[in-house]
A protein has these predicted regions:
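Flexible hinge motifs at transmembrane-helix junctions and intramembrane kinks/re-entrant loops
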Residues: 39-53, 57, 66-69, 154, ...
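Transmembrane helical segments that form the transport core of multi-pass membrane transport proteins
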Residues: 244-331
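Interfacial helix-loop-helix linkers and transmembrane-helix boundary segments
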Residues: 43-52, 70-72, 98, 118-133, ...
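Intrinsically disordered, low-complexity non-transmembrane regions of multi-pass membrane transporters
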Residues: 1-23, 29, 75-87, 91, ...
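Alpha-helical membrane segments and immediately flanking helix-loop junctions
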Residues: 100, 104, 112-118, 133-143, ...
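Entry/N-cap segments of selected transmembrane alpha helices
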Residues: 123-145, 303-328, 379-383
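Hydrophobic transmembrane alpha-helices of secondary-active transporters
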Residues: 61, 99-125, 264-267, 285-307
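Membrane-embedded hairpin module used as a gating/binding unit in multi-pass transport
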Residues: 196-272
Length: 402
């Protein structure tokens, strides 16, 4: 009987329940609650469920004491040396294997490949001026970098230059880009930045409208834009090739993201590789999304997530996103003035690369002011330009700080 009781005691002492009673054990319980809350947002509120659901579940798995699903000490530093590869293969958990795709920068470009197969660049080709709106929305990234450096200079929080650059990319409202940049510059902040980036992407319909209305007049919001011209198939095919060459020559570090985005789009527009285009946009993208979200979620352990840095990242991320939206709208106002009122400034807010949510918000706000107005296709131009812009901004940040 005594041996049986000792066995039960031993089982309990080696269980995760016992570890909750250890110093700091309550932090893991808090993180599990945070993961459950994110699951609620994904399932009930449908906030970015494709990403948030596996990410939140990964967060829960990583904070179950003793699960051993990931060992972040393997990934400290800029690269993986040969002995560490062997250590991961022999003793690593499931998330260690999956996280190698993040560490090596494999998943985000493949996500961009899938995005390219679903993206229509015709509105941008039809109205090249909308590229300026997509570029203007990236000012939020660089403005937030300066804000993070200011916080560091005043001693409020000790963000390094690389960490500041990684945080600022949240302003692009592009989850894969944020993960790609952070994994290169500040992998220790990956979980916090990924959660913030995807949360703000889901909150686009909440965050953007007040900013759009505050910066525009009713007259500007009711502007009806001319119908876009038809774009030939030849131009649709030439565009991704031309963009890849030009952008890669100007910003080589952006080549991998822009190149994969344009490869996916070329598959779509060429019309000769339907089978692999559908695979890239459906099966492959779905698989990579699961791997990416789960492995990133597993990096959000209590000791790296529950600190003051996370709070500042969330605040700076909101500032970055708001600045990007405001910059796009202000650029739209300039174009409104220069064209004699032919451009509706509301489409400028779609310059952030949350596709197609930001464009839908422009459409919704515009239609609330003028029910006969249809801005969706006009807003898609800046929206897809924002995807290119965020990839270019990522390349610039990696080039400077990588």
């Amino acid at each position: 009987m005594t041996q049986f009781i000792d066995t039960l005691v031993g089982i309990f002492q080696s269980s995760g329940f016992a570890r909750f009673g250890e110093p700091g054990g309550y932090l893991y319980a808090i993180m599990i609650c945070v993961g459950c809350f994110l699951l609620y947002l994904a399932i009930v509120k449908e906030f970015e469920p494709l990403i948030l659901l596996p990410m939140a579940f990964g967060m829960i798995l990583a904070n179950l004491p003793g699960s051993g699903i990931i060992h972040m000490q393997y990934f400290v530093g800029d690269g993986l040396e040969h002995p560490m590869w062997i250590e991961i293969l022999n003793n690593g958990g499931l998330a260690d294997m999956l996280y190698m795709g993040v560490k090596l920068g494999i998943y985000p470009p493949l996500i961009f490949l899938g995005i390219g197969t679903m993206t229509d660049f015709a509105p941008l080709i039809s109205n090249p001026k909308s590229l300026l709106l997509g570029a203007a929305a990236q000012f939020g990234i660089f403005g937030t970098y300066m804000g993070a450096r200011l916080l560091a200079a005043t001693g409020i929080v000790d963000f390094t230059q690389k960490q500041s650059a990684a945080i600022s990319i949240i302003g692009g409202a592009d989850g894969p880009t944020a993960i790609f940049v952070t994994s290169r510059l500040a992998p220790e902040l990956l979980g916090s930045i990924a959660v913030a980036a995807y949360s703000y992407m889901a909150l686009v319909p909440v965050i953007q409208p007040p900013i759009m209305k505050a910066l525009t007049t009713k007259k500007e919001r009711t502007v009806v834009m001319k119908q876009l011209r038809t774009v030939s198939k030849t131009k649709r095919i030439i565009f991704p090739i031309m963009v890849t060459i030009i952008v890669s020559l100007i910003v080589p570090d952006a080549a991998v993201l822009v190149g994969m985005l344009m490869l996916g789009n070329l598959m779509k527009e060429s019309g000769v590789v339907d089978r692999i285009q559908k695979t890239a946009g459906n099966e492959l993208m779905n698989i990579i999304t699961i791997f990416l979200a789960l492995s990133v979620g597993c990096t959000t352990s209590a000791n790296t997530f529950l600190n003051s840095r996370t709070l500042f990242i969330i605040v700076l991320g909101l500032i970055a996103f708001s600045f990007g939206t405001a910059a796009g709208v202000l650029c739209g106002k300039v174009m409104y003035a220069l064209t004699g009122g032919q451009v509706n400034p509301l489409i400028g807010s779609a310059g952030v690369s949350a596709v197609p949510m930001a464009a839908r918000v422009s459409q919704k706000v515009g239609q609330s002011e003028n029910p006969s107005n249809f801005l969706l296709m006009h807003a898609m131009g800046p929206n897809v330009a924002g995807v290119i812009g965020s990839a270019v901004a990522a390349g610039i940040l990696i080039n400077i700080f990588g």
